[in-house]
Amino acid sequence: EMLDGEEFKSIEFIGIDYSASAIEYAKKDFLADKNVEFICHDINELEDLNLGKFDLIISIGTLQSSNINFNAVFMSIYQNHLESGGAMILGFPNCRWIDSEMVYGAKAPNYSFSELSLVLKDIHFCKKYLQQKKYRVVVTGKDYLFLTARKIV
């Protein structure tokens, strides 16, 4: 269900990306919206921003960068930025383009074919961690694998 204009204006949205060009591109779509903020920053150092906590955290394709300590950053986001009872949506890339053809899975070192164990390891870690914190966790998707977690009440 889509939010109406007043509902949208009552919610604070913050987007964070390491890429300055991605931030500038995103800002163009939300120029008139005072409740939407975009920040160019390294997510390894989120604590520098003093963001506080949020009811919903969405991270799509950002935690799988090679310069990120996945487990530590994920746990920090959960512990420091998700409200008690909040929800998370995490998107894990499950495909890449090679010569105009979509290939599923990731290219792993020393393999001549796509391999899923790295992304499945990350998804399993998040799922197990959140289930231990009493979240209902569902994994869906195809091109991206989405982990959706809601607190069990």
Locate the predicted segments by residue.
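A short SAM/SAH-binding and catalytic strip from SAM-dependent methyltransferases
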Residues: 54-69
